[in-house]
Amino acid sequence: MWNNQGGFDGGSGMGGGGYMQSPGGFGSPAPTQGEKKSRSRSQQIVPCTVSQLLSATQNDEVFRIGETELSQVIIVGIVRHAEKAPTNILYKVDDMTAAPMDVRQWVDTDEASCENMVVPPGSYVKVAGHLRSFQNKKSVVAFKIAPVDDMNEFVSHMLEVVHSHMVMNSQGAPSGGGSTMALNTPGRMGIGDSGGAFSGGNDNPTNGLTPHQNQILNLIKSCKGNEGMAFEELKNRLHGMNVNSIRKTVDFLSNEGHIYSTIDDEHYKSTDGD
């Protein structure tokens, strides 16, 4: 839960299911009795990765990851871009599981508070908010953004992602069977999805790549066209990252046999993407 200093007290708010009850202080509207019955899980705060949020399905304004209904979510990542407008601040938050996620925080124009301060790019943050979709583009509308000073909190968040979704999947699965969710967590975290085993993310448990390298490899894998992904598109998807760093990573992945060029030296496909 959020502590009195505006930070996030990660451990104490976890329930037996690995996810957190939404305190009244989060500003969520009180549900009606009907909503309580039909959407019993939607008031939980669910720890997620960006990849999970981007792949969440939507039906009648309700988002789900597998059988888990989402309303309030938590992600942890690094701010790649920050842009302040009169009424809101738009961030791009990158947890290295997919392209950076748009996070919008509305500001109080009537008073100068810490909520109105822009978190600078390069800072790690923990974001709590609501998943939204507009014109088929998902984003998070944040009601709390707190800086992360200890990188152990990033590791802890990924473990919470694994634990909470395992528990909620097992609770929602039919007797005698279970649904499996690909968590798609950063490769160096060693977090997989096979019954909770720590087996490495992104369908490549022992590739030995860094999170940055895995992120670029997964973006290239996601392109199903015969021509592969253009380097220009890769730059656009990784907005805020240093272009030279992207180029060096692409060259490394090519030299190591993870990707190959297609129609020219600016288009790439994964060697195991078919």
UniProtKB/Swiss-Prot annotation:
The keyword Chaperone does not apply. GO terms for cellular component: chromatin; chromosome, telomeric region; DNA replication factor A complex; nucleus; PML body; site of double-strand break. Transmembrane segments: none annotated. It is found in: Nucleus; Nucleus, PML body. Residues 73-147 bind DNA. PANTHER family: REPLICATION PROTEIN A-RELATED (PTHR13989), REPLICATION PROTEIN A2 (PTHR13989:SF16). As part of the heterotrimeric replication protein A complex (RPA/RP-A), binds and stabilizes single-stranded DNA intermediates, that form during DNA replication or upon DNA stress. It prevents their reannealing and in parallel, recruits and activates different proteins and complexes involved in DNA metabolism. Thereby, it plays an essential role both in DNA replication and the cellular response to DNA damage. Component of the replication protein A complex (RPA/RP-A), a heterotrimeric complex composed of RPA1, RPA2 and RPA3. This is Replication protein A 32 kDa subunit-B. It comes from Xenopus laevis. The lineage of its organism: Eukaryota, Metazoa, Chordata, Craniata, Vertebrata.
